[in-house]
């Protein structure tokens, strides 16, 4: 039984060694490649576009900041940190004069014009970006 798989593995090698096998395979692979690449490109773009348009963000409260019941949110890649701050302030019904700080992975505060997609690419893990929010300065 061990000889049969070896001979099966050797057959493609011997076919590849012969020029006829490569010529026969080339038209067959050439014909499926354009449709598959055309099918893969839109297929890849559509799911990648869906997943890349929306990023999962896990929002965690720090200190005396009110805790959001919904912690996991799907946010567009192009949304800025300032947009998130405004959203969280409205969601928590904070006064406009109250400050809200956002930290990435409990380490640094990104700039308000930073896009969420860029932060996700650099600091995302397990398919999500963890952001901590608080009313007083905590880290960095």
UniProtKB/Swiss-Prot annotation:
Residues 25-42 have a biased composition (Low complexity). It is a peripheral membrane protein. Its main location: cytoplasm. Changing residue 63 to D: Impairs E3 activity of the ATG12-ATG5 conjugate. The keyword Ribosomal protein does not apply. GO terms for cellular component: Atg12-Atg5-Atg16 complex; autophagosome; autophagosome membrane; cytosol; intracellular membrane-bounded organelle; nucleoplasm; phagocytic vesicle membrane; phagophore assembly site membrane. Acetylated by EP300. One of its GO terms (molecular function) is protein tag activity. InterPro entries: Atg12, Ubiquitin-like_domsf. It is found in: Cytoplasm; Preautophagosomal structure membrane. Ubiquitin-like protein involved in autophagy vesicles formation. Conjugation with ATG5 through a ubiquitin-like conjugating system involving also ATG7 as an E1-like activating enzyme and ATG10 as an E2-like conjugating enzyme, is essential for its function. The ATG12-ATG5 conjugate acts as an E3-like enzyme which is required for lipidation of ATG8 family proteins and their association to the vesicle membranes. (Microbial infection) May act as a proviral factor. In association with ATG5, negatively regulates the innate antiviral immune response by impairing the type I IFN production pathway upon vesicular stomatitis virus (VSV) infection. Required for the translation of incoming hepatitis C virus (HCV) RNA and, thereby, for the initiation of HCV replication, but not required once infection is established. Small amount of ATG5-ATG12 conjugate is enough to perform normal autophagy. Belongs to the ATG12 family. This is Ubiquitin-like protein ATG12. It comes from Homo sapiens (Human).
